[in-house]
Amino acid sequence: MWGSGSVRCQNVAQASCSLTTFIAVKVYNTNARPACEFWISVKQNSARTPSTECFETNLHTVQISNEPSNETAALLSRWKSLTTEVDSKLENCIEKLSKRCPDVLREAMRYSLLSPGKRLRPILCLLGAEALGGSSFNAMANAAAVEMIHSYSLIHDDLPAMDDDDLRRGRPTCHIQFDEATAILAGDALQALAFETILSGNTDPSIAVKSCLVLAKAAGPEGMVGGQSDDLRAEKLGGGVEMLHAIHARKTGAIIQASVVLGGLAANATPEELEKLSIYGDCIGIAFQIVDDLLDVESTSENTGKRTGKDSERGKLTFPGIFGVRASRDRAAEFVEQAISIVDSFGPASTSLKQFARYITDRSH
């Protein structure tokens, strides 16, 4: 093992010269990003039949760096600060529930909503608001709401009738920790609480109504729920590239896209600005899912906090399954570059959104 962290190796080229074979090896970190390339020479000492005794193997070059770039480090620092604010808001929303909410339901909601996670969607909402001159404070209700929708979707996705998962964010899933009925109700409750949070947290009624409409459409039958329905259907009937994109654009991409648009709404964005945020969100939503598919193939449960390898076991449509690992990684990078270019017109204020887009392909979980 060279350097720190887990790596995997891939033979990417091979050339022979006389009795010496040179093998180019590319090493990847657990985040599916190239860490280094090096050459190994394998010299056969004689022309006789090869055996384990007649080879000399030499490692010529090794260079590994697992340190995050300055750009990524800056984003992660800001991310940590905003996550604290988001978690405080989420905790407050749960604590404000009256005694009419049963204790077991409240605890199941809290267990899932406040479990350790990236808070990627609410952070994206807040960064979207800031990119257009708004404040994270004014966008916080929308940010909390989108995390509630995301948490509700995870609770339901993990159920035995859906993806049948027992591990989420490094902890037992909600239906394992409590029971199936409580998990279903906790998901239902978080969905309802999301819209209540938007309506009670936005002082401008117009922004509140528009925000509810965006989130409802993204989470509903034409968005996340529709994508999940097609995903389950594809496990039985199969599908191709068109179905793959249709599933992920809705199941994962729709809520990510809505997150940044909700930030724009909180910042009183113009229709043109909202359209650019929508395109940006669509691009990084697809990139995010591609990387998720790659992590399921190449990472570990300890690293991702959820069971890996399950997509191939269930016969799910995935980008690596159709395009292969290398082509999938290239596609993710292309979508990220498209996302970055679309927010260029926002000027210096778009820096955080650009950093966020690059993080999508750099992440390890």
Task: Set out the residue ranges of the language-model regions.
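Solvent-exposed loop and edge beta-strand segments that line ligand/cofactor-binding
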Residues: 112-118, 179-183, 248-249, 328
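Conserved N-terminal diphosphate/IPP-binding helix and adjacent helical/loop segment
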Residues: 2-145, 149, 155, 161-164, ...
